[in-house]
C-alpha cells in the first residue's frame, strides 16, 4: 500500500482550524475534571504538528523528552472511552477519560522522566470523508486536556502500519532517531485476548516488538492479568513444534492421475502445486485463474485427453465439489487422490496477511475464510479417492524470520 505523503493543507487553514478547535476545547476537554490548570505542564499554547500519509496519521504535541524511558498506549478503550456508551464515537466531542486515574497517572509518568506515545488502529477513517477531520478535532481536544508532550501514530488502513504489525513502531523509531532499550518500554492496551475483548491485537503488537505489556485495568487500577495461551495457533510456537518435521515431498505417480487439493484459502495449496506438482509435468487447474467451474472442467478434460496428469488447485471444501473430479477420473478410468492441507483457520488467516505484506499478493476477504469453514467436509477414501494424504503446513525456511510474527 502506498505511503506517499499527500500535500498538507495550507498553514493558514490549519491555523484557522486550530483556533476554532481551541475555542471549542473547553466544550470537548475541560469538562474532564482531571485537566484543571493547576496541573498543566505546558503553560503556553502548543500547536499540534500533523503528518498525514495515505495510511498513517502522526500527531505531535510538544517536544518529547530525550529519555530512554517510554510508555506507549492504545487510545480507545485504554486512555479514553465514549461518553455516549457507543462502541465508536459519534463525533469529536464523544469522548471522556477511560478512568479518573488516567490523567494523574500520565502526569506522574511525565514527572518521572517518561515520554508518552500512542499507537492506535483507526480503520474507520477512510470509510467517511469527514472522519479524518473529526479525528483530528478529537485528538486536539484530548491533547489540550492532557497538556503534556505526547505523540500519536494512527494506522488507518490494513497494511504494514496496522497493529499487530510493527509499521507504526518502526516509524516511531525513525522519528526518535536514537537507540532505544526495550527493557525500559511498556505498551498498555485493552485488546488482550481476554473473554469479552474484541481481539488480542495490542498484546500481539507488544509481543512482536518484544516489550512488556499491560492491560489498562492492570496499569491504571492495579488489577491482575493472565495472558491467553494461544493454544490453537501461535506463529513462533508453531515453528518450534514443526522444526524437526520433514517437509512434504510430492511423489509423482507412475500412471496418469488426478490430484485434488483441499484446504483453506492461503493454506499453501498453490505453493505446493506450483513448486512440487506442476514441476513434475502435471497440468494445474485453478478457478482463480480460469474464473468459472465450467472452464476448469474443460481445461482438466483437455489435459487428460493429452494423457497428462492434472492437479486441481482449488479449496474443494465439500463432498459435492470434489465429486465432479471423482466422476471425471472414473470416466477416464484413472486413479484420483486427495491431498488435504491441514492448515487451521488461524494459520490460513496469518498466511493471508503475511503474503499481502511481504509478497504484494491480494489480501483475501473475510468471507473467503468464513465460507470455507462453514461448508468444509473432511475428505475420505469413501468418496472415491484411492487415498487421502494429510499434509501439515510447513513454512519455507527462507521466510521463517518474518513469518514468525503476529499478522492478525
Curated annotation (Swiss-Prot):
Binding residue positions for ATP: 263-270
One of the record's GO cellular component terms: nucleus
Keywords: ATP-binding, DNA damage, DNA repair, Hydrolase, Kinase, Multifunctional enzyme, Nucleotide-binding, Nucleus, Phosphoprotein, Transferase
CDD domains (alphabetical): HAD_PNP (cd01625)
Annotated positions of the Phosphoserine modification: 8
One of the protein's GO biological processes: DNA repair
Catalytic reaction annotation: a 3'end (2'-deoxyribonucleotide 3'-phosphate)-DNA + H2O = a 3'-end 2'-deoxyribonucleotide-DNA + phosphate; a 5'-end dephospho-2'-deoxyribonucleoside-DNA + ATP = a 5'-end 5'-phospho-2'-deoxyribonucleoside-DNA + ADP + H(+)
Compositionally biased tracts (Polar residues): 10-19, 28-38
Keyword DNA repair: yes
Region (Disordered): 1-38
Pfam families (alphabetical): AAA_33, PNK3P
Gene Ontology MF term list: ATP binding; ATP-dependent polydeoxyribonucleotide 5'-hydroxyl-kinase activity; polynucleotide 3'-phosphatase activity
Domain of life: Eukaryota
EC number: 3.1.3.32, 2.7.1.78
Similarity field: In the N-terminal section; belongs to the DNA 3' phosphatase family.
Function: Catalyzes the phosphorylation of DNA at 5'-hydroxyl termini and can dephosphorylate its 3'-phosphate termini. Has a role in the repair of breaks in single-stranded DNA.
PANTHER family: BIFUNCTIONAL POLYNUCLEOTIDE PHOSPHATASE/KINASE, BIFUNCTIONAL POLYNUCLEOTIDE PHOSPHATASE_KINASE
Protein name as annotated: Bifunctional polynucleotide phosphatase/kinase
Species whose genome carries this gene: Schizosaccharomyces pombe (strain 972 / ATCC 24843) (Fission yeast)
Amino acid at each position: 500500500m502506498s505511503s506517499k505523503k499527500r500535500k498538507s493543507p495550507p498553514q493558514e487553514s490549519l491555523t484557522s482550524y486550530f483556533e476554532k478547535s481551541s475555542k471549542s476545547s473547553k466544550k470537548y476537554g475541560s469538562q474532564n475534571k482531571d485537566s484543571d490548570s493547576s496541573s498543566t505542564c505546558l503553560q503556553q499554547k502548543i500547536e499540534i504538528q500533523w503528518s498525514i500519509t495515505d495510511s498513517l496519521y502522526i500527531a505531535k504535541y510538544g517536544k518529547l523528552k530525550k529519555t530512554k524511558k517510554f510508555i506507549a498506549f492504545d487510545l480507545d478503550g485504554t486512555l479514553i472511552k465514549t461518553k455516549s456508551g457507543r462502541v465508536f464515537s459519534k463525533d469529536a466531542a464523544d469522548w471522556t477519560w477511560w478512568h479518573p486515574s488516567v490523567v494523574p497517572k500520565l502526569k506522574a509518568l511525565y514527572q518521572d522522566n517518561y515520554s508518552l506515545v500512542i499507537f492506535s488502529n483507526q480503520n474507520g477513517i477512510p470509510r467517511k470523508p469527514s472522519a479524518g477531520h473529526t479525528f483530528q478535532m478529537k485528538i486536539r481536544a484530548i491533547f489540550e486536556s492532557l497538556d503534556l508532550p505526547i505523540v500519536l501514530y494512527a494506522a488507518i488502513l490494513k497494511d504494514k502500519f496496522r497493529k499487530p504489525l510493527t509499521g507504526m513502531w518502526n516509524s516511531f523509531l525513525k522519528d526518535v532517531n536514537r537507540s532505544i532499550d526495550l527493557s525500559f518500554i511498556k505498551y498498555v492496551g485493552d485488546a488482550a485476548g481476554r473473554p469479552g475483548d474484541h481481539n488480542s491485537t495490542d498484546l500481539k503488537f507488544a509481543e512482536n516488538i518484544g516489550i512488556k505489556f499491560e492491560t489498562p485495568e492492570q496499569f491504571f487500577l492495579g488489577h491482575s492479568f493472565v495472558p491467553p495461551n494461544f493454544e490453537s495457533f501461535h506463529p513462533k510456537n508453531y515453528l518450534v513444534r514443526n522444526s524437526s518435521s520433514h517437509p512434504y515431498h510430492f511423489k509423482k505417480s507412475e500412471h496418469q492421475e488426478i490430484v485434488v487439493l483441499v484446504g483453506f484459502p492461503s493454506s499453501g495449496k498453490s505453493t505446493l502445486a506450483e513448486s512440487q506438482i506442476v514441476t513434475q509435468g502435471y497440468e494445474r487447474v485453478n478457478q482463480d485463474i480460469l474464473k468459472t467451474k465450467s472452464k476448469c472442467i474443460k481445461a482438466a478434460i483437455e489435459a487428460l485427453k493429452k494423457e497428462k496428469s492434472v492437479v486441481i488447485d482449488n479449496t474443494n471444501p465439500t463432498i459435492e465439489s470434489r465429486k465432479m473430479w471423482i466422476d471425471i477420473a472414473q470416466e477416464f478410468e484413472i486413479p484420483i487422490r486427495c491431498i488435504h492441507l491441514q492448515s487451521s483457520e488461524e494459520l490460513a488467516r496469518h498466511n493471508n496477511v503475511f503474503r499481502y505484506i511481504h509478497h504484494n499478493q491480494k489480501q483475501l476477504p473475510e468471507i473467503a475464510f468464513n465460507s470455507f469453514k462453514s461448508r468444509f467436509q473432511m475428505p475420505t477414501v469413501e468418496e472415491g479417492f484411492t487415498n487421502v494424504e494429510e499434509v501439515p503446513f510447513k513454512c519455507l525456511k527462507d521466510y521463517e524470520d518474518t513469518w514468525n510474527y503476529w499478522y492478525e
